[in-house]
């Protein structure tokens, strides 16, 4: 045992083992630190997001209350608008019904004058051609008016 190499080998081995364990501990502690950093970072980001969400909710609630208060102060304007719209709708319905009645009465008069011999006004062939042209023009105009009225009724029915 007096051999220095015999003692140096175990001491060297012990030194290597302690260095290895120390470096492993340092690596493990670095891993723990790096694992804690993202958690704390995520926690702080989550806290910020939560606080910001609460702020936005409060702001929206205040804006809504402000809107309600303004609507309550100017409520007569909203009622007036509704009344104006109701009047306009009623007037449109009345005018549409009147146009339909006028058109039906025009058709009835036109049919009656044809049956009664409405051609007695046009004595010669030139007058007859002119009357036919006028009648054709009136028929086209009334047909166009009737189609527009029907389309308007259809669009009103679709919006309601």
Curated annotation (Swiss-Prot):
<feature type="signal peptide">
    <location>
        <begin position="1"/>
        <end position="22"/>
    </location>
</feature>
<dbReference type="GO" id="GO:0031769">
    <property type="term" value="F:glucagon receptor binding"/>
</dbReference>
<feature type="propeptide">
    <location>
        <begin position="116"/>
        <end position="127"/>
    </location>
</feature>
<protein>
    <recommendedName>
        <fullName>Glucagon-1</fullName>
    </recommendedName>
</protein>
<dbReference type="InterPro" id="IPR000532">
    <property type="entry name" value="Glucagon_GIP_secretin_VIP"/>
</dbReference>
<keyword id="KW-0964">Secreted</keyword>
<dbReference type="GO" id="GO:0042594">
    <property type="term" value="P:response to starvation"/>
</dbReference>
<comment type="function">
    <text>Promotes hydrolysis of glycogen and lipids, and raises the blood sugar level.</text>
</comment>
<dbReference type="InterPro" id="IPR015550">
    <property type="entry name" value="Glucagon"/>
</dbReference>
<dbReference type="GO" id="GO:0005576">
    <property type="term" value="C:extracellular region"/>
</dbReference>
<keyword id="KW-0372">Hormone</keyword>
<feature type="propeptide">
    <location>
        <begin position="23"/>
        <end position="40"/>
    </location>
</feature>
<keyword id="KW-0732">Signal</keyword>
<keyword id="KW-0165">Cleavage on pair of basic residues</keyword>
<dbReference type="Pfam" id="PF00123">
    <property type="entry name" value="Hormone_2"/>
</dbReference>
<comment type="similarity">
    <text>Belongs to the glucagon family.</text>
</comment>
<feature type="propeptide">
    <location>
        <begin position="74"/>
        <end position="79"/>
    </location>
</feature>
<feature type="region of interest" description="Disordered">
    <location>
        <begin position="112"/>
        <end position="132"/>
    </location>
</feature>
<dbReference type="GO" id="GO:0005179">
    <property type="term" value="F:hormone activity"/>
</dbReference>
């Amino acid at each position: 045992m007096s051999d220095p190499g015999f003692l140096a080998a175990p001491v060297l081995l012990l030194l290597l083992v302690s260095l290895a364990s120390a470096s492993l501990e340092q690596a493990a502690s670095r891993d723990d630190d790096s694992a804690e950093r993202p958690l704390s970072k995520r926690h702080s980001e989550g806290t910020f997001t939560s606080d910001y969400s609460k702020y936005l909710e409060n702001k929206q609630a205040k804006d809504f209350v402000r809107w309600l208060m303004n609507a309550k102060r100017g409520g007569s304007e909203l009622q007036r608008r509704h009344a104006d719209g109701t009047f306009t709708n009623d007037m449109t319905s009345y005018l549409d019904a009147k146009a339909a009645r006028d058109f039906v009465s025009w058709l009835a008069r036109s049919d009656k004058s044809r049956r009664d011999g409405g051609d007695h006004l046009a004595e010669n062939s030139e007058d007859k051609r002119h009357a036919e042209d006028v009648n054709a023009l009136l028929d086209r105009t009334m047909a166009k008016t009737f189609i527009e009225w029907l389309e308007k009724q259809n669009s009103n029915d679709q919006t309601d």
